[in-house]
A protein has these predicted regions:
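Active-site pocket-lining/capping segments in soluble small-molecule metabolic enzymes
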Residues: 1-111, 115-262
Length: 262
């Protein structure tokens, strides 16, 4: 809803979790928003799961014909299994690599170009100097979002209290009192553990622009409506007070963007 209310002239792509396929895409209010975005020239993508094991392959295999007819421009994938699954079935829409399908150097970019995949997400492990050497003018750069520190089939809820078959979020705390958020995806039986503080490069905007990324990604995972609105205002509203307030409202990190060469 917050994206629906934003001016679309500055939005190039919207990527939605694949779970909207089969539920949300059939709902009128979601269809209305999709129609609005597409008429505004916004590209629409579905994001594939972090783990693409046999159960995911079976589900997507059963749904592939309907899935392939969705009003989308392509998909964002996070693993090789999803790539080969799509290629084996002749998927001919755009494929975008997420940041964990590493492209550290020109050899990596060339490999994927040979696979007819040219859109990628800049690796989170590289700093600004390394990103400049990589050349991300044909890639996306994550400028806001929580990072998965672990993706695991070892379900925390199942281990500690038994499987409830209900997806949700648990808070973990380590010996240094740092918090992590564990989201369990029961439909495909895996966990994603996120950092408490998201990456936020808004204060580095001039340096981000010097890299000329094709897209600047704002990635939402655990945010509620109010938090989402705050983040969007921080990036889309040019009023300096709004930008400053957005920075104060959220604890954040700049990730590896300012770090020295590893």
């Amino acid at each position: 809803e917050e994206l629906y209310g934003q001016g679309t002239q500055r939005i190039g792509r919207i990527a939605l979790d694949f779970r909207l396929f089969g539920t949300g895409f059939s709902e009128t209010h979601v269809r209305d928003r999709i129609d609005f975005w597409r008429k505004s020239g916004v590209e629409l993508y579905l994001v594939f799961p972090h783990i693409f094991r046999e159960n995911a392959q079976e589900w997507f295999g059963r749904q592939f014909e309907n899935f392939n007819q969705l009003p989308i421009d392509g998909v964002v994938i996070r693993n090789f299994e999803a790539f080969f699954f799509l290629k084996e079935r002749g998927f001919d829409k755009k494929i975008i690599l997420d940041h964990n399908l590493y492209i550290f150097n020109q050899y990596g970019k060339e490999f994927w170009k040979q696979q007819k995949v040219e859109d990628f997400t800049a690796p989170l492990e590289l700093n600004s100097r390394e990103l400049r050497e990589l050349d991300i003018r044909d890639g996306e750069l994550l400028v806001y979002g929580r990072i998965p520190v672990m993706v695991s089939a070892q379900c925390i809820e199942r281990t500690t209290s038994g499987c409830s078959k209900k997806s949700g979020v648990r808070v973990l705390q380590d010996r240094r009192d740092e918090k992590f958020f564990a989201r369990n995806y029961c439909d495909l039986c895996y966990n994603v553990i996120y950092t408490e503080n998201p990456i936020n490069l808004r204060q580095e905007w001039d340096r981000v622009n010097e890299l000329y990324p094709k897209m600047r990604r704002i990635q939402f995972t655990l945010e509620d409506k109010e938090q989402t609105e705050t983040v969007l205002n921080t990036f889309f509203v040019t009023d300096e007070k709004t930008v400053a307030r957005g920075k104060e409202d959220t604890d954040f990190t700049t990730g590896h963007f300012n770090r020295g060469i590893i």
